[in-house]
Amino acid sequence: GEVLSLEDEDLIEEADVLITLSNQGYIKRLAQDEFQAQKRGGRGVQGTGVKDDDFVRELVSTSTHDHLLFFTNKGRVYRLKGYEIPEYGRTAKGLPVVNLLKLEENESIQTIINVTKDQVADHYLFFATRQGIVKRTNVNEFSNIRQNGLKALNLKDDDELINVFLTDGQADVIMGTKFGYSVRFAETDVRNMGRTATGVRGIKLREGDHLVGATIVSDDQEVLVLSEKGYGKRTPASEYPRKGRGGKGIITLKVADKNGPLAGLTTVQGNEDIMVITDTGVIIRTSIANISQTGRSTMGVKVMRLDEEAKIMTFALVDAADQKDQEE
């Protein structure tokens, strides 16, 4: 892509836009008014132009002049301004993101973060890796990123980035592992480190275990966990006490043959829908409200029926309103 000079950028109207990235890697920009009209007219998620075997995994509300940071599983970060992502109509599939970003082989976008001008000074990016390593870095360390990306954190060979999220410096973080353990700690337990630092231990993993989810948590939320065999539950976040980082953690899901290992952990308000992807490529959608509220050290209840051999690989939260629109 061409690099616009500042004068050229001034010619681009500052407007609110939505950026969507589909599970199969298609990206596009939608004008906000397209989106609002689409909401009023119903149809919801179908307005995003994705095929049946795909869905919108990242939906970011931003401005044409804001910066978007794209973090990959390999710990690299790429940066685009909102206007650099091509605009498409509602029903168009979009552009393969590899056409915009110089991704390496086996490299995929894990998270997109919108950084507004007023967040640069006092906000942090919090990183969590598969091996339980965490890192916190000031957002302003990511202000000049070349087109072919930058290393956002130093990963060991067998490690990969699981999640990155923006924090205000005062948040609590919760992490969950495949064997069903979790830790919750204040983000300030992780000191601010430079961009190339490796990070510190967030959770002490048992042999063979690895991280499957990490996010910000507060006591007015619920912690949602889902197992590979389709069991799930919601638990009030207050049942997860804040401890220091680096411990072995407490049980977030009793893992047994019946329910299988933990597939993911996130926090919810309770009014969202969830999109679940199995290793056979099936996408199942259900309302969070359908998932029972139970205590922290339980097995959960069957949330969805899976084919005999299928396992849940991952899931994403989506706005529940979309579903209602489709039913009208």
Per-region residue spans from a language model:
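Short, structured "edge-of-domain" segments at secondary-structure transitions
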Residues: 1-328
